[in-house]
Amino acid sequence: MTRINVGIPPAELFLCIVLVEHREIKRIPNCVAKGKYNMDGMPERFKLGTGHVKFFYNKLLYLKKRYVRLYEECIERGFNVQNYIEAWNDIPAELMNDYNVRANDIRIIRERINERLSK
């Protein structure tokens, strides 16, 4: 599983969530850089579950920007985390696209966070 808390500012997330996302977000560009990705069946809209990682294969600029915010938030909170920004090196230019977050994306993520925290 790879957690991407789309549209939620890292400053609003609990520390454990920020640290996990910081660690996991780099999986997607690493996968793409190694050529271990397939665009078949890529969802048109953000979702959780099957296909949620594929959704980001052509939105790697969005993930890079999000990663920078996550990294900065970790540092701001006093954590000594490794900077994985180099994971976005060697990404094909056609996959380095941004993404405009939709209100429904945020709703989906907030519901998932609340569900996880209530357990």
Language-model features: locations:
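Extended, charge-rich alpha-helical interface modules
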Residues: 1-119
